[in-house]
Amino acid sequence: MQQNIIKVIVGSKNPVKINAAANAMALLFPEYEIQTQGMDAPSGVPAQPMTDSDTRQGAINRVHYCQQQVEADYYFAMEGGVDCFEFGPATFAYIAIAHQARLSIGRGALLPLPMQVYQALEAGEELGHVMDRLFNTVNIKQKGGAIGLLTHGHATRESNYTQAIILAMAPFLNPELYP
């Protein structure tokens, strides 16, 4: 880290993901200037991950790609996905954070999905497109996301990512507890 500057690379150009990373780091390191930059990073999984494991792997793949491209203090990747659990379909996001030689994985909250939405995803659509059609919105995935729509704005995609990032940062905030 340069003096009082933390450089963060986010494995996406999506402003929701970049803002979540910037907000989380500003909360965790208020004495530092946080320089956050997004970059396109391939996930190596389907555009709409349909399993927990594909979603997690997509975040890991994105963070590793970023590490190979540019120097930074921290690398963040967020991958949204869906799965059908015993209680029904839900969407969630995995967070992968790399700092030096350490990797931390976290996951955001689960948002239950209507069965009609899950069925459209099984048919090959992406969640953002399904939600845009259902709620007559445009490019919701770069705004409040399905979370914002289904919670009537009481939670957003960005707020979910921000909380998940803060939790996934625990090993970096307490390195002596995570050898």
Curated annotation (Swiss-Prot):
Keyword Lipid metabolism among record annotations: no
Gene Ontology molecular functions: ITPase activity; metal ion binding; nucleotide binding; ribonucleoside triphosphate phosphatase activity
Details of cofactor binding: Binds 1 divalent metal cation per subunit; can use either Mg(2+) or Mn(2+).
Cofactor dependence: Mg(2+); Mn(2+)
Residue sites binding Mg(2+) per the record: E71
Coiled coil: none
A matching Pfam family: NTPase_I-T
Protein residues bound to substrate: E71, A72
BP-aspect Gene Ontology terms: nucleotide metabolic process; thiamine metabolic process
Reactions it catalyzes: XTP + H2O = XDP + phosphate + H(+); ITP + H2O = IDP + phosphate + H(+)
Superkingdom as given in the UniProt entry: Bacteria
UniProt enzyme class: hydrolase
Keywords of the record: Hydrolase, Magnesium, Manganese, Metal-binding, Nucleotide metabolism, Nucleotide-binding
EC number: 3.6.1.73
Protein purpose: Phosphatase that hydrolyzes non-canonical purine nucleotides such as XTP and ITP to their respective diphosphate derivatives. Probably excludes non-canonical purines from DNA/RNA precursor pool, thus preventing their incorporation into DNA/RNA and avoiding chromosomal lesions.
Family that this chain belongs to: Belongs to the YjjX NTPase family.
Summary of subunit composition and partner proteins: Homodimer.
HAMAP family for this protein: Non_canon_purine_NTPase_YjjX
The protein's name: Inosine/xanthosine triphosphatase
Organism: Shewanella sp. (strain MR-7)
